[in-house]
């Protein structure tokens, strides 16, 4: 169910594909999900592909289809089936769920207290208790588990410690890789772990995933120089494909992951104050969120 919630943005969901028998929503394709609730795929049923080609894709059925163990049922259309019948690829469908998502990440502690109070859920705070602190972790992660247990534990950090990033539009594969690796595809706050950091080097490199980075073609390579605060990813032109990095000073030779420009894909700019990142050590987790603001400094 959380997978479905993650697809809905501002109460709407974008159609990726339409056919006579179903609508497809493919934004989270590639995210592996467990086999859970398997039922007949009757008209109005919502399923998520849990195995094989197209894993992670959401389907809403216009016609009855046979039961498949590769599809997990996550819901059923109650009202508005006529909108599903006429929706076309590229259009948006307004969605209202009987149960709203209890997603607390990237909200302040004060906001979360009110949300959980209204939901009748006990709030357990782990660590920082300031009202203006930003929630970066919640346990359980999923709405259905929070409601079942009647309580949730949250971890917060100071607002200035949250690393916000404005992503570019001309490196779609690389941006998606970063969001997949960090968890930003499904959640408003993600995590990346420091792989390499040496004082005085003015660079921090984060862990990657070679398997997920397979096929990461060159896109949005630097031209004349890399600017401080830019986030870069090593592409498939290098053996270190998938590594993520940031530089704290401009460089005319090497990218944010210490690779040449041909092996570097720039995915965005850090828009928050990032000087403290240079002081962090290997193994430290950095919390990240997407931003629409411009970089705070150049």
Which residue ranges define each predicted feature?
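Cyclophilin-like peptidyl-prolyl cis-trans isomerases
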Residues: 1-298
């Amino acid at each position: 169910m959380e997978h479905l919630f993650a697809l809905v943005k501002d109460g709407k969901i974008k159609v990726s594909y339409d056919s006579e028998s179903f609508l497809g929503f493919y934004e989270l394709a590639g995210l592996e999900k467990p086999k859970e609730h398997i039922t007949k795929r009757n008209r109005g049923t919502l399923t998520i592909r849990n195995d094989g080609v197209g894993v992670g894709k959401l389907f809403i059925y216009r016609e009855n289809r046979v039961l498949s163990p590769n599809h997990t049922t996550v819901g059923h259309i109650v009202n508005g089936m006529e909108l599903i019948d006429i929706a076309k690829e590229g259009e948006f469908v307004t969605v209202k769920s009987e149960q709203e998502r209890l997603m607390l990440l990237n909200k302040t502690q004060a906001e979360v207290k009110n949300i959980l109070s209204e939901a009748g859920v006990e709030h357990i705070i782990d660590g920082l208790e300031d009202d203006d602190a930003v929630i970066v972790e919640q346990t359980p992660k999923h709405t259905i588990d929070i409601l079942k247990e009647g309580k949730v534990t949250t971890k917060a950090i100071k607002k200035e410690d949250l690393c916000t990033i404005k992503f570019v539009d001309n490196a779609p594969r690389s941006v998606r890789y970063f969001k997949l690796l960090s968890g930003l595809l499904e959640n408003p706050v993600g995590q990346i772990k420091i792989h390499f950091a040496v004082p005085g080097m003015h660079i921090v490199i984060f862990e990657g995933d070679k398997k997920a980075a397979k096929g990461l073609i060159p896109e949005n390579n630097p031209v004349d120089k890399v600017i401080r605060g830019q986030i870069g990813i090593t592409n498939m032109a290098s053996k270190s494909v998938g590594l993520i990095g940031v530089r704290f000073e401009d460089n005319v030779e090497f990218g944010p992951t210490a690779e040449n420009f041909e092996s570097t894909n720039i995915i965005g700019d850090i828009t928050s104050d990032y000087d403290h990142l240079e002081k962090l050590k290997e193994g430290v987790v950095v919390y990240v969120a997407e931003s629409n603001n411009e970089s705070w400094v150049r």
